[in-house]
Each structure stands twice: as structure tokens, then as C-alpha cells.
């Protein structure tokens, strides 16, 4: 009887130790995931939104629903006759077509 009792105490101790190790692993995974989300949020705050000027930072556009916006540039003639380049973050035509097809597919199939 004493052997069964000691064996039971040993199993309970072993189980509590292993579950504590698993909880520590889960806590570490949660912390890593939280840090990753915070870093992504910071990067999202630094990006340039759609339809805003990206002339000086052509690779800093934000992400859209499916794709990252692209910096699209045009040449503008000012009132004084000078040609200058103006850029804005927008969705390229082939990305618009892909988003349209995906949206249409979602309406039909899902």
C-alpha cells in the first residue's frame, strides 16, 4: 500500500512538472507572437497609405487587401513649364483584376 501511495505521489509530481514545462513553452510562444505582432504594427504605421505621395520613398507603400500597393509615378508639368515627377501609392491594374476575380469567386463559391 505504501508503494502505491509513493508511486502515486511520484506520478503527480512528474505530471505537475511536465505540465509546468508545457505552460512555460506556451507562454514563450505567446510572447514571441505578441512581439511579432507589435513589430508588424509598427511597420504598418510607418508605411504610406493608398493615394498618398511616395515620391521620396518608393518602396514604403502599405499593404492592400491582397497585395502591397505599388508606387506609381507620372510626369506633371507645372505652371512655370517645368516637368516634375509625382508618385502615389496605388493598386496596379493587374492587381485590381486579380482582386476582382477573387472577389467574384468568393461571391460564387463561398
Curated annotation (Swiss-Prot):
Compartment(s) of residence: Secreted
Propeptide: 21-44
Secretion signal span: 1-20
Keywords: Disulfide bond, Knottin, Secreted, Signal, Toxin
Pfam families: Toxin_35 (PF10530)
Cited InterPro entries: Spider_toxin_CSTX_knottin, Spider_toxin_CSTX_Knottin_CS
Keyword set includes DNA-binding: no
Main location: secreted
GO MF, one annotated term: toxin activity
One GO term describing the cellular component: extracellular region
Tissue: Expressed by the venom gland.
Free-text comment on this protein's domains from its UniProt entry: The presence of a 'disulfide through disulfide knot' structurally defines this protein as a knottin.
Family statement drawn from the similarity comment of this UniProt entry: Belongs to the neurotoxin 19 (CSTX) family. 03 subfamily.
Protein name, per record: U1-lycotoxin-Ls1kk
